[in-house]
Swiss-Prot record:
Subcellular location: Endoplasmic reticulum membrane
Any one Pfam family match given in the protein's UniProt record, by short name: DAGAT
Catalytic reaction list: an acyl-CoA + a 1,2-diacyl-sn-glycerol = a triacyl-sn-glycerol + CoA; all-trans-retinol + an acyl-CoA = an all-trans-retinyl ester + CoA; 2-(9Z-octadecenoyl)-glycerol + (9Z)-octadecenoyl-CoA = 1,2-di-(9Z-octadecenoyl)-sn-glycerol + CoA; 1,2-di-(9Z-octadecenoyl)-sn-glycerol + (9Z)-octadecenoyl-CoA = 1,2,3-tri-(9Z-octadecenoyl)-glycerol + CoA
GO biological process, one term: glycerol metabolic process
EC number annotated for this UniProt entry: 2.3.1.20, 2.3.1.76
Role played: Catalyzes the terminal and only committed step in triacylglycerol synthesis by using diacylglycerol and fatty acyl CoA as substrates. Required for storage lipid synthesis.
Bilayer-crossing regions: 15-35, 37-57
Protein name: Diacylglycerol O-acyltransferase 2
Classification via PANTHER family: ACYLTRANSFERASE, DIACYLGLYCEROL O-ACYLTRANSFERASE
Amino acid sequence: MVRFVPWNVPLYRRLETMAVAIYAMVLPVCLIMAFNLIVIPLFWGIAIPYLVWMFYFDTKHESGGRRVSLVRNSILWRYFRDYFPISLIINSNYDPKKNYIFAYHPHGIISIGAFCNFATNANNIDEKLPGLKVHLLTLESNFKIPFLRDVLMSFGMSSVSKKSCENILNSGAGESICLVVGGAEESLDARPGLNEITLKKRKGFIKLALVNGASLVPVYSFGENDIYDQVPNPRGSLVRKIQTKIKDLTGIAPPLFMGRGIFNYDFGLLPVRHKIVTVVGEPIDIPKIKSPTDQVIEHYHQIYVEALQNLFDKHKNSCADKETGNLKIN
């Protein structure tokens, strides 16, 4: 039986749900607007110059976006934060003269914790990391969608391309990036109670840190995998093979997930209410090596994996649900 939302839900909870619904509607609304812009002749006078500018002249998505404080500090994101709720724990001090790569785990279905903590100022990251400007990175393909690209850049978000990463890390003291290391593949392992990440073969971010002399910071979000359920898709199953094939062809993973609705608790595309605790570890200083060997990359990869495991073990009992399993690294 479907459980509907009662009529006497407090106003603040309705506002929290509204904030999450607005977040969920950004992509479809932008797609509808882009479609209308292109197919309706009335709008071509706007569409042609906008698309030319977007594809041939505007490269801000490769250099840190166009951060708008009004957007990042909006009260909307405070309600968004409180819906789950989402909290941020920072375990160290960071040198504002250095550049950092914050490596975020796990991906979850849509990296809610990464967005709230690194793209908005809902948990006061700007005050907790004084002197640092952290840019959350996302797929290059997201910046090919009219209007969506402008929304993303207003949060200071940028492309996850190599060029974008290096542009930001070399643009001045304190300029830093947040990478969701597991990517699309990891989203297929996101389900409640599991802490399964894709990391063993992910070494590009280690090389990026070495080439640019940026310090690495492990970040783990307890609860990121608990806000959506997902159709069973064990490795080797037909469902997983189809998902992997689509991911290989498009770069986008299609997890078959289910959350809740605006007016019910049992089905829909909104995430369920479940606390997310994002823990930021201590920085790992990395030497600047323009042409690191595979052995050097492997060495620092092992150091990073150990640091992430220690971070998880240290905070698991205090930040995660009792039924949460151990960290599994694929």
